[in-house]
């Protein structure tokens, strides 16, 4: 005899999965995971944040503007991420996130002090600010990890010199 699953149960399961899939996915760790800059607090404390260089990246449907960023090691930056699109976008660069010491991430929900960034999701119409000091030189891939966004060209590169 075949198993019958009530339609309400299937609908509830689908709606729950959809809600979880659409939930904001900004991921930060309070302690640096392996591979991340480890001595963040003294590095960010040693910087004059009044001298932070402002950089703005606009996120919209399938592009970062600009999509190529260059930073200098040891220089403080205030990176403003403006989502001007109609859907959420991520600013994700695992290598870059491992190469910087983050002082603070500020979202409309408030600041998070000295986080280790894993993924930044910026909902439509939202602006997030990341204050950081680049530590390790290199060139790192940048992508939006929302479904198909990188396939449609929402990619870039970040260079630390």
List PLM regions with ranges:
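Short aromatic-acidic-glycine turn motif
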Residues: 97-108
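C-terminal motif of bacterial Sec signal peptides marking the signal peptidase cleavage site
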Residues: 18-21
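Beta-strand cores of secreted/periplasmic/IMS beta-sandwich domains, seen most often
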Residues: 67-92, 127-136, 160
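Short, compositionally biased
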Residues: 93-99, 146
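Short beta-strand and strand-turn-strand segments in soluble, beta-rich domains
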Residues: 107-115
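N-terminal edge beta-strand
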Residues: 42-77
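Bacterial N-terminal signal peptides that target proteins for export
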Residues: 2-11
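Extracellular/periplasmic metallocenter environments
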Residues: 23-38, 63, 114-161
